[in-house]
Amino acid sequence: MRSDVITKGSKSAPQRSLLSALGLTKEEMERPLVGIVSSQNDIVPGHMNLDKIVEAVKMGVSMAGGTPIVFPAIAVCDGIAMGHEGMKYSLVTRDLIADSTEAMAMAHAFDALVMVPNCDKNVPGLLMAAARVNIPTIFVSGGPMLAGKVDGCKTSLSSMFEAVGAYNAGKITAEKLDEYENNVCPTCGSCSGMYTANSMNCLTEVLGMGLQGNGTIPAVYSERIKLAKHAGMKIMELLEKNIRPRDIMTEDAFMNAMTMDMALGCSTNSMLHLPAIAHEVGFDLNVDIANEISSKTPNLCHLAPAGHTYIEDLNDAGGIYAVMNEINKLGLLKTNLITCTGKTVGENIEGCINKNPEVIRPVKNPYSQTGGIAVLKGNLAPDSCVVKRSAVVPKMLKHEGPAKVFDCEEDALEAINTGKIVAGDVVVIRYEGPKGGPGMREMLNPTSAIAGRGLGSSVALITDGRFSGASRGASIGHVSPEAAVGGNIALVEDGDMIQIDINANTINFLVSDEELARRKANWKPRKPKITTGYLARYAALVTSGNRGAILDIPKF
C-alpha cells in the first residue's frame, strides 16, 4: 500500500510516532489509510451539514476495514460572494482546492480518498485533484437544498435575485422582498435548482465518480447519510480492486457527461469545469464538441431556472440514473464503462425507470430536440462563447439589437436599474474575463435585474465573464478571446448592431472588416486591475474560457 512508506519498517518509526500522537493504534496503522476531504464550513449553506456527511463516511470506512483520516478543503458560497469584489475569488478557488488537496494527499501517502464537496468550485476542484493524484477515490456530496415557497409555489435563490430587480423597478413592495428573503432558502444544501453546484454533483454521478443519488438526494434526507456510509464502504472495495479515477474518467466518460449535460440542461459553468477536469486526466476536451453532441441529444429536463421543477423533484422522479436510462433509449451513452460502483454504466442504469414524465420528459416528447447548452462563434467570439439554450425564451433564440457597452459589472447594473436599458438592447459587459476581471465574475445580478424589470424576453446580455447557473434568458458568456487580451469584444462600441442566432450557433457584430481592423489597430491593453496576491498570480497564468480557464504552466 502507498501508506507503507509511513507505517511499515524501522525507517518509518518517526512517522508512526506522529501517527501515534494523533491517537491512532498500531491496529489502525496496519489498515489502509483513507483520506476524507471535508469541505465543511459555517459560511456556505451547502457545506454547513458536511460534518455529518463526513462522520457517516468515517463509519463506512471503519466498517469496511479502513482507517479514516479527515483533512479540509476550502469552499466559497457564490451567492454570498455575488455582486462585489468577492466574486473575483470564486472561480480561482477551483485551482486552489485542486492544488491543496493534491498536496495533502501526496504529503501524507494516503491509500485512497473520499471527497466530500457540495458547491460550485469545490466539486470540480476536487475532481481535478482526484485526476492528478489518481489513487482510488469516490465522491459523496452534501446534497441539494429543498425548494422554498412563496405564495404557495416552489421557488429558489434565482427568484430571490430576480425579486431584487423587481423591487428596484417598483414592481414589488419591501414586504414582498422580505418574504422572498425569508423563504427561498429553507434548508441547508446546495441551492435547489439545476445551478452550478447541482450540475456538477449530477455530472459527477454521470462520470462514474459518485454513487446513485449523489447529485439528487436532498441534504436533509436521512438517505443522504446512508449514501455517505455506503461511499465509505465502497472506497475500500475500489482500493481492493485498484480502480482509480483515470480508469473511470475516460474520454468516453466525458462524452457521457457532455451528453447528460445537454439532456439535463446544466449550468454553462460545466463548459468551464469539464474541460479543466479532462485536462488533469490528460486530454483536451474542446467545447466545440458540445454542438455536435447537442444536435443529437434532446433536452429532457427543465429544472429551475429554466422551469418550475427542482432537484428534489428530479430525485423523486428517479434521479440521474433514470435520465440516463431514458436518454440511452436513443443509444447515446457509452454503457461499457467502469464506475465507482464497481459495475458498468449499463449495469448501473438498467431498470431505473422514469417515475414522473413531467419532470423527466420521455425521449419521444422532449422540451427540445437539441440539448440545453449551445456554443456560438462569430466575429464577436472567434474562439467561442456559451449560452444555456434551455433557459432562453423562444423569441430570443434569434435577436438583433444595438449594443450598450460597459467595462465592468457595476456600471452595467447601474444602467439596468436606472432604466437606461430598454427592450431590444444587447448589454455587453467586458473586461470581466479570467485575466481581465480577474477571476471571471458571474453576472447573476445584471441578468436578474433584467428579468426583474420584465426585460428577460427582449434584452440579451453578452460577457467575457460567466453566469451563475441561476441566470436565465439570452445570457451569453465565456466570450473568447476575452477583452483583456484584445479579443473582439473589446472592439464593440455603443450602438453597434449585434446579431445573435442561437439555433445557427452564431454571434456577430455588424461592422465591416475594414472598421474592425481600424479599431483593432487603435486598441491598447489595459493595466492589470490587481498586481499583488493570489489574483495577480492567477491572472498571469490563467487561459481563456474556451480552454476551461485552466492555468497555463510556463515551459522551462
Swiss-Prot record:
Question: Which residues does the annotation say bind Mg(2+)?
Answer: D78, D120, K121, E442
Q: Which InterPro entries match?
A: Dihydro-acid_dehy_C (IPR042096), DihydroxyA_deHydtase (IPR004404), DiOHA_6PGluconate_deHydtase_CS (IPR020558), ILV_EDD_C (IPR056740), ILV_EDD_N (IPR000581), IlvD/EDD_N (IPR037237)
- Pathway participation: Amino-acid biosynthesis; L-isoleucine biosynthesis; L-isoleucine from 2-oxobutanoate: step 3/4; Amino-acid biosynthesis; L-valine biosynthesis; L-valine from pyruvate: step 3/4
Question: What does the annotation say about its assembly with partners?
Answer: Homodimer.
- Give the E.C. number(s): 4.2.1.9
N6-carboxylysine found at: K121
Note on cofactor: Binds 1 [2Fe-2S] cluster per subunit. This cluster acts as a Lewis acid cofactor.
Assigned keywords, A-Z: 2Fe-2S, Amino-acid biosynthesis, Branched-chain amino acid biosynthesis, Iron, Iron-sulfur, Lyase, Magnesium, Metal-binding
Q: Which GO terms describe its cellular component?
A: cytosol
Show the PANTHER family listed in the entry: D-XYLONATE DEHYDRATASE (PTHR43661), D-XYLONATE DEHYDRATASE YAGF-RELATED (PTHR43661:SF3)
Question: NCBIfam families recorded for this chain?
Answer: ilvD, PRK00911.1
Highest taxon of the lineage: Bacteria
Q: What family does the database annotate?
A: Belongs to the IlvD/Edd family.
Q: What is this protein called?
A: Dihydroxy-acid dehydratase
Coiled-coil ranges (or none): none
Q: Which SUPFAM superfamilies match?
A: IlvD/EDD N-terminal domain-like (SSF143975), LeuD/IlvD-like (SSF52016)
Q: What's the stated role of this polypeptide?
A: Functions in the biosynthesis of branched-chain amino acids. Catalyzes the dehydration of (2R,3R)-2,3-dihydroxy-3-methylpentanoate (2,3-dihydroxy-3-methylvalerate) into 2-oxo-3-methylpentanoate (2-oxo-3-methylvalerate) and of (2R)-2,3-dihydroxy-3-methylbutanoate (2,3-dihydroxyisovalerate) into 2-oxo-3-methylbutanoate (2-oxoisovalerate), the penultimate precursor to L-isoleucine and L-valine, respectively.
Which cofactor does the UniProt annotation name? [2Fe-2S] cluster; Mg(2+)
